[in-house]
């Protein structure tokens, strides 16, 4: 029996809306990364982008367990000497919660061309409102 290989023309893409208020950051990000890769479909093929579109709401209300909010640092470098900038996750979520959630999901995807294609299907919003009603997204509840 031959293995099934999905072709890009055959893929049906759905839109999902996920509310992450009160959900742990890592658990929500890993499930969303799995949906973006297409691992929830029977036609999953590792070298083809078979994933669906995901709209994430309430990114600022995501939960960090333990002391991570204060102790874990969000770092980036400006590429100038001495340009390492760092802030705690509590401050980062207060300032740019959508970017923090976006980065958590991006780091769980492959790091090549296919991963860059997959991350473009993720839309992250602060608050309850989004502007993708025209796509008729389905509400999806995360497992944990």
Swiss-Prot record:
Output the GO biological process annotations, alphabetical, semicolon-separated: negative regulation of translation; translation
UniProt record similarity statement: Belongs to the universal ribosomal protein uL13 family.
Name one molecular function that GO assigns to this entry.
mRNA binding
Gene3D superfamilies cross-referenced by the UniProt entry = Ribosomal protein L13
Q: Which UniProt keywords apply?
A: Ribonucleoprotein, Ribosomal protein
Signal sequence annotation: none
Classify the source by domain of life.
Bacteria
- Function noted in UniProt: This protein is one of the early assembly proteins of the 50S ribosomal subunit, although it is not seen to bind rRNA by itself. It is important during the early stages of 50S assembly.
Q: Which PANTHER family match?
A: LARGE RIBOSOMAL SUBUNIT PROTEIN UL13M, RIBOSOMAL PROTEIN L13
Q: What is this protein called?
A: Large ribosomal subunit protein uL13
Gene Ontology CC: cytosolic large ribosomal subunit
**Record's subunit section:** Part of the 50S ribosomal subunit.
Originating organism: Clostridium acetobutylicum (strain ATCC 824 / DSM 792 / JCM 1419 / IAM 19013 / LMG 5710 / NBRC 13948 / NRRL B-527 / VKM B-1787 / 2291 / W)
